[in-house]
């Protein structure tokens, strides 16, 4: 994928997910008074006459409504909807099915653009019923998926993902098949299914055209983030470290490149510094923010495990130096993760030595079998109680 701007290949940015990101930023205490973010968001609201969205925005962010602005936008909405209704009425009286469908689509797109969620959903569903061409039906489903992502409506996203899959199986083209993977991957990030997100994103790195969701740099950044937490080291090397498309973009993303390569090259103190930067970025990202604590914790465990795999034992001082932290910090971290069963090692407090005690594969399989057997037994017992009732 070349780096030049190819946004014309994407679908319309309607709704524009950048608006959802700006709204999220303004909900954070540290950005609540950020004039630049507020100005950018309000410029989008005014430019698109987003009266319904503006009312909901003021309510959620506890803003004072600008009554004059709201009335002006409502008037613009009424005038445009009247014009669109007249065009639809004319098409129904004088034109064919294709023109009727186009008029219905224009109204649905306008309702979507101004932030009238329920009105847009109703209009798109009516248009869908009037649409025969498979490609056009899929484009409507992509609209519904974008609305779902914009408002983070889980039910809307899951229902329309299944609908899109079904339509693609009927004969969807290559471009729409790949586009759906990006939509699914983005939703997987939102619900913390990083493994599935990595698989979907890596499948579409070389074919990405979903600029209606994000630019290519953001897509590559997300791909690196989810791949690092989801992939084993050999897969990370083959699919990311050696990925030509990813490497090309990483030249213009030095912080992301350092984050990726510092872990792979075992430069742990640099990795910890990069992880701290990633943590701050994730806090400000509307998709990653709910998961940043989990992500950072898992990546620390990942780094500790990677170092420990190379040794039978090593001193706490060596580990602390490797990660660029104090001995007390590393002692507390390891103790916490060992107690939780996340690290296979033990700490000799007297000699300040960390000794690895990785379970062999047969022992691990035995423990897994026992665990799964207990779960199955519990489910059978619950089922038998229900049946007996």
From Swiss-Prot:
List, for all copies, the residue spans of the domain called PCI. Answer: 193-361
Q: Which GO terms describe its biological process?
A: proteasome-mediated ubiquitin-dependent protein catabolic process
Gene3D superfamilies per the record?
1.25.40.570
GO CC terms, sorted: cytosol; extracellular region; ficolin-1-rich granule lumen; nucleoplasm; proteasome accessory complex; proteasome complex; proteasome regulatory particle; secretory granule lumen
SUPFAM superfamilies in the record, alphabetically?
TPR-like, Winged helix' DNA-binding domain
Q: Which family does it belong to?
A: Belongs to the proteasome subunit S10 family.
**What name goes with this protein?**
26S proteasome non-ATPase regulatory subunit 6
Which organism does this record belong to? Homo sapiens (Human)
